[in-house]
């Protein structure tokens, strides 16, 4: 995440009436374990430890379970694994869920890699597509 820019990212969504309804990280660090083996098993299923297919499928389930209307993806330049397959995974999620996808760049280790203007433009475009999809459905 772009921790130094949480105000900018949350304002960009709030000002457009967009709610963030799910996150992939919620279950990554919120688990209980009693033994070291249980801890290891839990950590082997966090987002950064699984392959593209499992990552995609977890996200598709989250999108469908929460009736997601659009996907906003942060490409974290400090996380090489995710930066490498994030675009393909996002494309597959968009197709499987029939939702628009927008991505923006950032870097948890170097905040200079975040552009508020890029973020705002991407969120604006995503919002326009989501609104057009709603209008086409008569909502």
Residues of each region from the PLM?
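Acidic-and-aromatic substrate-binding clefts and catalytic sites of carbohydrate-active enzymes
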Residues: 50-53, 79-83, 110-113
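Peripheral docking tails and interdomain loops at the edges
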Residues: 87-139
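Active-site proximal loops enriched in glycine and acidic residues that flank catalytic Cys/His/Asp
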Residues: 22-25, 75-77, 105-108
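Intrinsically disordered or highly flexible coil/loop and linker segments, enriched in small
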Residues: 5, 68, 72, 132-136
């Amino acid at each position: 995440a772009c921790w130094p820019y949480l105000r900018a990212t949350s304002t960009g969504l709030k000002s457009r009436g967009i709610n963030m309804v799910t996150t992939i990280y919620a279950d990554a660090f919120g688990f209980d374990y009693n033994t070291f083996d249980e801890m290891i098993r839990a950590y082997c299923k966090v987002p950064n430890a699984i392959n593209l297919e499992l990552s995609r499928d977890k996200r598709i389930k989250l999108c469908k379970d929460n009736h997601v209307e659009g996907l906003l993806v942060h490409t974290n330049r400090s996380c090489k694994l995710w930066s490498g397959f994030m675009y393909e995974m996002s494309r597959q999620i968009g197709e499987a869920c029939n939702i628009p996808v927008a991505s923006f760049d950032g870097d948890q280790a170097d905040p200079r890699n975040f552009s508020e203007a890029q973020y705002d433009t991407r969120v604006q475009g995503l919002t326009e597509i989501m609104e057009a999809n709603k209008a086409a459905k008569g909502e």
